[in-house]
Amino acid sequence: MNRDMKYIQVVVELLLCCCLYACSPCPESVQPADRLLELYPEYQDVTIPCNVAPLNFLVRNEGVDAVCVSVKGASDSLQINARGNKAVFPLKAWRALLEAEKGHTLEVTVTARTSGRWLRYPSFAWQVVADKLDAYVSYRLIEPGYEVWNALQIRERCIENFEERILADNSQTDGKCMNCHVHGGNSGNLSMFHLRGEGGGTILNRDGKLRKLALKNGQMISAAVYGDFHPDGRYGVFSSNVIIPMFHTESNRRLEVYDTVSDLAVADFDGNRMIVSPLTADSTVLETFPTFSADGKWIYYCSAPAVPLPDSVQQLRYSLCRIAFDANHGTWGDRVDTLWNARLEKGSVCHPKASPDGRYLLYTVADYGTCLLYTSPSPR
């Protein structure tokens, strides 16, 4: 681009900015708000990584038709004015602000116009940390509901700029269900997901090479369901479950989802075999949600004694357990350790995950069961 073209581009951009600013309402005769600020998503008083995309939001207070948002840091600031109730930050200015304010706190003030009156809400904080998150997150896109579904995709999204791409689309697999996608070591070079129905299987990706696997043998009650990769990528640990949805007749309760039977098994992707232990394949015990420790020496999972179902579903409580695993020989340990006892704690553990550095284990505690889609976790 020559100098004349660059000059024209700069002038056009300045004119556009001036027009946008002139068209955007500016607060005047501002009064303090007498009610709490309602945002969606709820971004008030949160800690954010320095590489996150703009925290755009909606002001959900009734009757808002214009907003002004001021973000002030120690050395830089950003302000936007917009019609409607949506606050959208320019990506370039947002990135510059976060880069300048690493390790500092941003003060965010929202002023909104309602019925011709400008109201200023109490400020809240965004703490900017110098640490970066991995740039990509994968998720399953499906219509909300629990009876029927149609379009289904597994997608990847960049948390730095909102860009997305489709990894798998059931419109290309005769409408088959796809679920339980997992990445190993937070890497795109090691991943898998289950393709259900006739001709289905587990689709394994290792360094861009795809394989369809049947992760089931005669000792297992079902094909693989919930799973995790061993750090070396050779093994995966899975539960096999018979999952039952049960609808309530009470108006304030909608749905229960529970396992009638469930066991664990390890898949040896190189040896093309499933490895089962009698300690985690007991018909009197339900085992589910297995995950490897960061060093691969332990398998953490949830375990509950079987109870009559559905009548005793609220007495179904899972403990947090672990068992050793020897990756050199592909063998399970010879004892089970209980780390969090459901009977003593009067709760139920689900979804354990080990931190990559091996220092922490994250899990959720429910009142009972392991499905939190229609029940609330206990405050603990």
Predicted feature locations:
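C-terminal motif of bacterial Sec signal peptides marking the signal peptidase cleavage site
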Residues: 21-22
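Blade-terminus and WD-like Trp-Asp/Gly-His loop motifs, strongest in beta-propeller folds
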Residues: 129-132, 182-190, 227-235, 291-298, ...
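Conserved small/polar residues in nucleotide/adenosyl-binding loops
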Residues: 374-379
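Short, solvent-exposed loop/turn segments at conserved positions within beta-propeller repeat blades
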Residues: 147-150, 196-198, 255-261, 311-318, ...
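Residue position within the beta-strands of beta-propeller blades
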Residues: 138-139, 191-193, 237-239, 300-302, ...
